[in-house]
Amino acid sequence: MSSSNFSCILSISLTFFILLLNKVNSAETTSFSITKFVPDQKNLIFQGDAKTASTGKLELSKAVKNSIGRALYSAPIHIWDSKTGSVANFQTTFTFTITAPNTYNVADGLAFFIAPIDTKPKSIHHGGYLGVFDSKTYKKSIQTVAVEIDTFYNAQWDPNPGNISSTGRHIGIDVNSIKSISTVPWSLENNKKANVAIGFNGATNVLSVDVEYPLIRHYTLSHVVPLKDVVPEWVRIGFSSSTGAEYSAHDILSWSFDSKLNLGFENNINANVSSSTQAA
C-alpha cells in the first residue's frame, strides 16, 4: 500500500471516529452567572413588581401588602428529551436576603421554580402562594416544581408548626402544589445574606437543596422528583416572591445556573448550546 493511500485511509478513519465521538457525546448545555444585577438586565424577564436596583440586586416583591414579583431567565431550558428519554443534570446557586420591619410579622417568602415557558403570575398568586400557585390549582397538575423559602405559616397547606418550629417557617420542595412534599424547619435571619445551592441528578431524579447563613445555620433536604413526568420538555426557570397582609422585601443578590442534557446517540448538529452572562 502506498503511503498516500495509507494517509487517505487514516484521515477517513480519524474523521469517522471524531464524528462518532461527537454523536455519542452530543449534549445541550446552558450556563450563566450573574454576580451583580444591572438596570437593563437583558437576560431576564420581569413580571409583576420585580425589578433590578441601582445597588446591583434583584428586587422581587415590594415590601407592601399583596405584592407579587417574578424574574425568569429569558432563554427556555431543555430539561428533558422526548427522543432519548434523557433528563438533564443541573445546579443552581444564588444568594438572597429577606428584610422585614420586624422578625415577627414576615411574609410570605420566595421560591426558585421551574415552569412551562408561558408561565405568568396572576393576582390570586399573592400571599402564601408565593407568586407561583393559587387556591384553584394548588391540588392540580400545573407542571411546576419549586423550592420555597417560606416565612409565614398557612394552616391550609403548611406543616404543623408544632411539629417543625414555633413560627412554621420552613424550606420546602413543591411539586405541582404549594403543599410541599418535603420540608425542613428554617429560621429567618433578618436582612442577612443566605446562600442556596440546588442540584438535580437526572439519573436518580434526586433534587437536593442546601441553604446556609454562613457561620450561623445550615439546612439541607432532598427528595425524588421525576421531572420528566412533571414538567414540560422545555421550561423556564426563575424566582418568585409574594406578600399578603404582612410583608417583607425579598432580594436576590447573585445567581448562577448550569445544566447539561445528554442526547446519547442523537445526531444533532446544533446539540451544543451555551450562554454566559457576567456582570461585574
From Swiss-Prot:
Entry GO MF terms: carbohydrate binding; metal ion binding
* Assigned keywords, A-Z: Calcium, Glycoprotein, Lectin, Manganese, Metal-binding, Signal
Q: Which domain of life is it from?
A: Eukaryota
Q: Where does Ca(2+) bind?
A: 150, 152, 154, 158
Residues at which Mn(2+) binds: 148, 150, 158, 170
Q: Name one GO biological process term.
A: response to symbiotic fungus
Q: Where is the signal peptide?
A: 1-26
Among InterPro entries, the record links this protein to: ConA-like_dom_sf (IPR013320), L-lectin (IPR016363), Lectin_LegA_CS (IPR000985), Lectin_legB_Mn/Ca_BS (IPR019825), Legume_lectin_dom (IPR001220), Leguminous_Lectin (IPR050258)
Pfam family for this entry, one: Lectin_legB
Q: Which Gene3D superfamilies match?
A: 2.60.120.200
* Sugar-bearing residue positions: 163, 272
Q: Does Zinc show up as a keyword for this record?
A: no
Misc: Lec2 is probably non functional, since a frameshift mutation leads to premature translation termination after only 98 AA. The sequence below ignores this frameshift mutation. Binds one manganese (or another transition metal) ion and one calcium ion. The metal ions are essential for the saccharide-binding and cell-agglutinating activities.
Q: Family per UniProt?
A: Belongs to the leguminous lectin family.
What name appears for this protein in its UniProt entry? Truncated lectin 2
Lineage, broadest ranks: Eukaryota, Viridiplantae, Streptophyta, Embryophyta, Tracheophyta
State the encoding gene: LEC2
